[in-house]
Design a protein with these regions (language model features):
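Short amphipathic alpha-helical segments with heptad-repeat character
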Residues: 88-91, 95, 118-121, 125, ...
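Secondary-shell segments that build the walls of catalytic and ion/ligand-binding clefts
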Residues: 178-179, 188-250
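Active-site-proximal alpha-helical scaffolds that flank and shape metal-associated catalytic sites
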Residues: 131-207
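Carboxylate/His-rich catalytic cores and anion/metal-binding grooves
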Residues: 110, 115-139
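Amphipathic, well-ordered alpha-helical segments in soluble domains
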Residues: 64, 93-100, 127, 172-179, ...
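Amphipathic, soluble alpha-helical interaction motifs
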Residues: 100-107, 130, 134-137, 183-186, ...
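A structural feature that tracks compact, well-ordered secondary-structure segments
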Residues: 98-104, 117-119, 177-183, 195-198, ...
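Terminal targeting/low-complexity segments that flank the catalytic cores of oxidoreductases
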Residues: 1-102, 106-114, 137, 141-144, ...
Length: 293
């Protein structure tokens, strides 16, 4: 498997060269009124990039960072609990993503999109398998994020395909990429780092494919459909803020220390999403920011 460079920017910009090239080609396809071909490019890339959970170095490297020698048993367990909570949140997200990807596969009317979503369903199921194995290696699971469950429910119950694609792929999949990079940077030499590097690429493809397909959907979208997207964003953003700032009890102290940094990143994430919405032809002037972003 080709992995990305060790020192990456902590943002969502692609650094995996085949993905960068696919994005360039998809943008050119859109400019030449061949948006469906752009979606198909990400199907082809997803097939080439496909990996298996057995490819990871199970039993050869530690699952999570090890506490330094000489630390007390209490400190070791507290540190393991922190990593278990990190793994649990990603497992939860990918369990929900399996359901959402299945919906997209069933609802998409375009052949190219159905092909792509057939790979995305497999990706999300593979991610769940890997997180389940990693959680077991790390000693089990921790507390679920209630706000993430609520966000997933909103996306699953969204009435239009345009809303589902925008919320899951254009918005959420992009936001997780910087988090994977942060986790990987903090867990050198572990299975956790390896998995996060793999998922950075996979979710980058999911996001870019979503942008390409949303262009297809927006081509014939009515003003009413576009207005629904903005209204959905206004319902979603306050819950997204709660999710982004939430910490389980194992990491509550980190949340207090990192609150200013978290809010700054959150503001950047929301502004990024608004720029993305604008680039797809949505009138973002009615989006209500949950804070001074």
């Amino acid at each position: 498997m080709t992995v990305e460079p060790l020192e990456e920017p902590i943002n969502a910009e692609a650094t995996y060269e085949p993905l960068i090239e696919a994005e360039r080609q998809a943008a050119a396809d859109a400019a030449h009124d061949n948006k469906g071909r752009g979606v198909l490019r990400f199907y082809e890339l997803a097939k080439k990039q496909e990996w298996q959970v057995r490819d990871m170095a199970w039993g050869e490297i530690p699952p999570i960072p090890e506490t330094r020698a000489g630390a007390s048993d209490e400190k070791k367990e507290r540190r393991r609990a922190v990593w278990r909570s990190v793994i649990t949140q990603q497992l939860q997200a990918d369990e929900l993503a399996v359901s959402m990807a299945g919906q997209l596969l069933n609802l998409a009317p375009h052949h190219e999109a159905k092909l792509y979503y057939s790979t995305m369903v497999q990706d999300e199921a593979r991610h769940v398998e890997a997180w389940l194995k990693l959680a077991n290696e790390a000693g089990g699971v921790a507390e679920r994020d209630p706000h993430l469950d609520e966000l997933a429910k909103m996306t699953l119950e969204a009435e239009t395909l345009e809303e589902k694609v925008f919320q899951m792929q254009v918005f959420f999949e992009r936001l997780i990429i910087p988090r994977f990079r942060l986790i990987a940077r903090s867990s050198r030499g572990t299975l956790l780092e390896d998995l996060c590097n793999r998922l950075t690429i996979d979710d980058g493809i999911h996001h870019s494919a979503g942008v390409a397909y949303e262009r297809v959907l927006m081509e014939d979208a009515s003003k009413q459909t576009k207005d629904r997207l903005v209204k959905a964003a206004n319902r979603l953003l306050p819950i997204f803020v709660e999710h982004a700032l939430w910490r389980p009890k194992e990491r509550a102290w980190i949340g207090n220390v990192m609150r200013e940094t978290d809010i700054r990143r959150l503001q950047e994430d929301v502004q990024d999403g608004i720029r993305m919405a604008s680039s797809l032809g949505l009138d973002v002037s009615d989006i209500q920011l949950p804070f001074a972003a």
